Amino acid sequence: MEAASTEGVGHNYLVEHSAGSGKSNTIGWLAHRLSSLHSDRDERVFDSVVVITDRVVLDRQLQNTIYQFDHRQGVVQKIDEDSRQLAEALEAGVPIIITTLQKFPFVSGQVAKMSEERGEGRKSHLPTRQYAVIIDEAHSSQSGETATELKGVLGGAELRQKAQEMAEEEGEVELERLFRAMAKRGKQPNMSFFAFTATPKHKTLAIFGRNGEPFHCYSMRQA
């Protein structure tokens, strides 16, 4: 939390938590702390905190844990219906959004459709907002075109265009390639990633880590 407050938006944090380390509790606590994090000017640092699991069905344990931290109406919204529900939550700036990675490929079209219905054309204010993205099991969920859509939805059209170009040239796009492209162009100023994994691969460390190392490590011995 101290680092996120000091460094501001646009950084990656790899959290290596071994099995039995209470990862769901840590993610729940982090989501709520990030959603209420304020700058020195007393402004909210993140407009929304998006908690993503790579499971097709929302992780019930993780979902319940997050709900336990705050029962107030409208603070936490689980996306268990369709992608339109997710798009509406992003547009509304719901403080904490819980969803699966599989829903993101459809969000771009839904956001544009809702903007048109309101007479706003095809421009969405999503890329101008600031997001904290918490990824559960980063090593398994961050690959393919679904992750590319996540970056495009929250990062804007320019990043999505770059991802599409890579997809055309190389077929299936892995997030590692996309992050390398982002690194060359600078970090995305409106997104901070908090990636949780028990078994970080070399590429995961290279992309999310700090100098190839996790930002925080809770080992099996400590657990």
Residue ranges and their predicted role:
Residues 1-223:
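RecA-like P-loop NTPase motor core of helicase/translocase proteins
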